[in-house]
Amino acid sequence: MKKLTSLLLSLVLMVSVLACGASAKTSTKVRIAGLKGPTTMGLVNLLSMEKDGTASLDYDLQLYGAADEIVPKLIKGELDMAAIPANLAATLYQKTNGGIQVMAVNTLGVLYVVEKGNTVHSFADLKGRTILSTGKGTTPEYVLRYLLKKNGLDPDKDVKIEYYSEASEVTAQMAAARKDAIAVLPQPYVTAAQMKDSGLRVVLDLTREWNKVCDTQLITGVTVVRTEYAKQNPDVIAAFLTDYQKSVLSLIHISEPTRPE
């Protein structure tokens, strides 16, 4: 729970820097998409805020299982904003010549190697093993491959990585797997999986491992916006960021247990 709260607090700090000067509620319908998982956690309360009248904007929020479902809609202008993996945002910025840009960082390091057993204690113990993972072609794949190489393992020869389209599929595979199954999962899926299986343990915090070999901060998810849309609607952007911050704060309130006085 501490890890989840830290993740949400990080998002509040990053969004609050940008959320100044928001205007009163407008009739603008903001079309926004998100991936199921940590990149979209901060957005989940927008619809309830809209329903109870506390949102500054009207939202059309759609959730998708894979990034390739979002990309064409964003490029075609069928979406205004999206919460996506950081590496994908960089690729889209290049491909669109700056037509899609980062508006906020929404997720820092939330990736973990977990095991249903007690055989893995370091990267060296992963040699010859099969690793279940989500995020092929996105941040989880690149982070895992990078760290394997930095720890002396060839990701194409020394391990076998099996990719699934959604983290929920990985957790299902782990639940059904025999002992010693290994996976890379993001929060909050790690916590959810451990609640269902007490034998599942975290063996490597990939943020800590990243910090050991790299001087830059590990950013896994961002919220992007079409540049043209942002230029034409600065008040909408400011209002959205304010709502975004409120949504995250409400999640922190829910996830943080009540403490006795």
Predicted regions and their residues:
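Pocket-lining segment of extracytoplasmic ligand-binding domains
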Residues: N87-L88, E169-L251
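Short, glycine-/small- and polar/acidic-enriched structural segments
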Residues: K25-Y164, K179-Q187, V203-L204
